[in-house]
């Protein structure tokens, strides 16, 4: 579909605002005293809403949602900051597979590094957060981001072990969901991905409109 001529208050815009809020808030975190964190969160969200959401009703609705999740975001961020320090925010990255003449590129929301040089990768979700089973079979986003990170494919990042990759749900159901590396190791998923790309490059492989059914129900 074509892009709308004028901005509309859709889920895409909401995602842009939420991602910008988290990026700016994390950058402000080191200079923000604990007692001032909620106020700073509200200030950043208000500035983004005023600049990008000119519809009063949507502005009021999104404002209430953002303020309602402020305490949860701050509490979760305090936990994350004890594990590692933010190293990459909204970073671009890529990994070249020369034997396949294929480049995997992506934008990662955030990568933290622990004192032991382990990497923690996070992706913000304003919609539904994929379950571990969905990630294992259908949604490989965290796996592919982690594979790029582990090979040092993102800007300002050296190769290192990805200890954990997780979705941070910022929607109505606030949720933290890690990738099931215990059920499917990252190295195994990466080999499967390379095999998939190699099979697609074969003249004998057709491109299916749907690889598998995501959900089956009566209606």
Regions found by a protein language model. Give the residues of each.
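RecB-family 4Fe-4S metal-dependent nuclease core
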Residues: 1-219
């Amino acid at each position: 579909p074509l892009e709308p001529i004028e901005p509309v208050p859709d889920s895409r815009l909401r995602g842009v605002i939420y991602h910008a809020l988290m990026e700016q808030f994390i950058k402000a975190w080191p200079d923000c005293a604990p007692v001032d964190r909620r106020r700073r969160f509200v200030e950043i969200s208000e500035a983004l809403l005023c600049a990008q959401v000119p519809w009063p009703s949507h502005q009021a609705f999104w404002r209430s949602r953002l303020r309602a999740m402020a305490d949860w975001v701050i509490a979760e961020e305090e936990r994350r900051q004890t594990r590692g320090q933010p190293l990459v925010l909204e970073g671009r990255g890529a990994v070249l597979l020369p034997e396949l003449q294929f480049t995997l590129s992506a934008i990662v929301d955030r990568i933290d590094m622990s004192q032991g040089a382990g990497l923690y990768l996070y992706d913000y979700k304003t919609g539904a957060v994929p379950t571990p089973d969905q990630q294992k079979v259908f949604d490989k986003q965290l796996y592919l981001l982690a594979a790029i990170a582990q090979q040092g494919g993102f800007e300002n990042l050296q190769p290192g072990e990805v200890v954990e990759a997780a979705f941070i749900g910022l929607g109505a159901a606030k949720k933290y969901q890690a990738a099931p590396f215990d059920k499917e190791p990252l190295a195994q998923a990466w080999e499967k991905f390379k095999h998939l790309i190699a099979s697609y490059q074969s003249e004998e492989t057709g491109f299916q409109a749907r690889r598998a059914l995501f959900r089956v129900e009566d209606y």
